[in-house]
């Protein structure tokens, strides 16, 4: 796949006990990296493939995003950076242009190879060195530039409509400086990422609670943190919502109110206790399942390390570290981080909605005014309604198993209880924890 600033080639499900297949895959990787022929006829065939890919991706939201980029990234390379780009270019670029591009950017100092599987590491390393020995580093290579994203004092707002979009949505971004790659392999980075994760988790819990109301102000809402849209040289805290056709104004005001409530008053001890416990439980689960981790999990971790310098100390280290770190980070520290993430400047807004007669959307001026009003919203601190009452006042009388049938489905044992509930039990060694689900028709 190709995205804004990376291309990843992947070969999966290779039978490692078949030497000839493994060797063929290494040759394929070699040719992708430096030896693609780029014959005129093959280039023309690929133009057709890319045209079809463009057509399949040319959705209403894709068109809105393409039009939004110049507003979100004014005077920037990111303003026009969709991977496929212009069909006019795809149809008409000279053959030599793609050959020059390939020679310029497909080179060993910008490439990494990740191989994960049931292999002999020393043998695989020797094969790699032999297969890739003829791939030479270029003389005076072009500089790999990471383009910065400018700050903005006034909100950058884009409003787009399209006939293919069915429901309105709005996204607010609060930009911040990206964490330096050179400092990511530190305890400090883990602590900051943990605190951001906790803040996002608790805000999402509040939004989910609102969604459960009888007549919620939005059909969906969420908060998040990561790269600013398509640029990894800037980070952003974001909050977004979707709504009914006539409800985007209420939706956007509600999510901004909850964002401001989190900034102004922070989160409660009880909210944090739950979020931290769930986080540590997930870490423990990953630790317990470490011997059964899938290859893709390792590969994705290695890709993040190679491209973004994300640390990869291993789950054993992370499990021990986070069980020491998390209990010693108070909720006050989380609240302070939220105040830093939700800024009065560096705000970007993307509103997308159906192009329909009679449907009205807030103007850029109205959205900007609402953002400026955030600090004056009439809000009260969030009240975490935690009950100390037992789940059941009285322990119910137990039923009984009325029938038991072995080998019913996939080697399970089927139990039928006296209240009609059907229970399927299967003992496996796939997971180190108990898995339970309770669906109903």
Model segments located where?
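Extracytoplasmic
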Residues: 4-6, 108-110, 167-169, 234-236, ...
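Scaffold signal of the M16-like zinc-metallopeptidase fold and its non-catalytic homologs
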Residues: 4, 21, 25-28, 32, ...
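Acidic/histidine-enriched alpha-helical segments
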Residues: 6, 37-55, 120, 139-153, ...
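Structured mid-domain segments that build the active-site/substrate or prosthetic-cofactor binding neighborhood
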Residues: 172, 177, 189-268
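Active-site-adjacent, His/Asp/Glu-enriched structural segments that form or flank metal-binding
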Residues: 1-62, 92, 96-110, 120-123, ...
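C-terminal regions of mature proteins
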Residues: 114-117, 273-417, 423-424
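Conserved small/polar residues in nucleotide/adenosyl-binding loops
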Residues: 436-441
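An aromatic/glycine/proline-enriched structural segment found at the starts
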Residues: 75, 112-168, 277, 281-286, ...
């Amino acid at each position: 796949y190709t995205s804004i600033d990376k291309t990843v080639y992947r070969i999966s499900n290779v039978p490692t006990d078949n030497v000839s297949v493994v060797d063929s895959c290494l040759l394929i990787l070699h040719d992708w990296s430096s030896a693609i022929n780029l014959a005129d006829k093959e280039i023309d065939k690929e133009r057709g493939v890319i045209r079809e890919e463009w057509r399949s991706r040319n959705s209403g939201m894709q068109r809105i995003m393409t039009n939004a980029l110049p507003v979100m990234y004014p005077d920037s390379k990111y303003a026009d950076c969709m991977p496929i780009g212009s069909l006019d270019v795809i149809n008409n670029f000279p053959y030599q242009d793609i050959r020059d591009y390939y020679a310029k950017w497909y080179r060993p100092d910008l490439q990494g190879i990740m191989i994960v599987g049931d292999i002999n590491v020393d043998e695989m390393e020797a094969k790699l060195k032999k297969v890739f020995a003829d791939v030479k580093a270029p003389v005076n290579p072009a500089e790999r530039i990471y383009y910065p994203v400018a700050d903005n004092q006034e909100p950058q707002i884009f409003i787009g409509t399209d006939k293919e979009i069915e429901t309105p949505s709005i996204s607010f971004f609060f930009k911040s400086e990206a964490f330096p790659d050179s400092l990511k392999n530190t305890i400090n980075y883990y602590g900051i990422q943990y605190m951001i994760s906790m803040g996002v988790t608790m805000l999402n819990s509040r939004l989910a609670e609102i969604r459960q109301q009888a007549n919620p102000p939005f059909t969906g809402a969420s908060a998040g943190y990561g790269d600013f849209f398509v640029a990894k040289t800037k980070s952003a805290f974001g909050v977004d919502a979707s709504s009914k056709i006539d409800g985007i104004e209420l939706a956007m005001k509600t999510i901004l109110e909850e964002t401001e409530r989190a900034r102004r008053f922070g989160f409660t001890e009880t909210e944090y206790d739950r979020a931290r416990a769930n986080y540590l439980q997930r870490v423990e689960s990953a630790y317990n399942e470490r011997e059964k981790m899938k290859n893709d999990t390792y590969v994705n971790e290695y890709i993040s390390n190679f491209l973004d310098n994300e640390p990869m100390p291993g789950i054993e280290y992370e499990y021990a570290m986070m069980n020491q770190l998390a209990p010693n980070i108070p909720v006050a520290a989380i609240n302070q981080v939220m105040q830093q993430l939700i800024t009065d400047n560096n705000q970007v807004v993307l509103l997308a909605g159906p192009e329909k007669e009679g449907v009205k959307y807030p103007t850029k001026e109205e959205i900007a005014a609402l953002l400026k009003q955030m600090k004056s919203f009439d809000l009260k601190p969030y009240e975490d309604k935690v009950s100390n009452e037992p789940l059941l006042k009285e322990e119910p009388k137990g039923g009984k198993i009325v029938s038991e049938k072995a080998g019913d489905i996939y080697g399970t044992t089927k139990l039928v209880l006296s209240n009609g509930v059907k229970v399927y039990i299967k003992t496996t060694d796939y997971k180190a924890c108990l898995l339970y689900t309770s669906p109903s028709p």
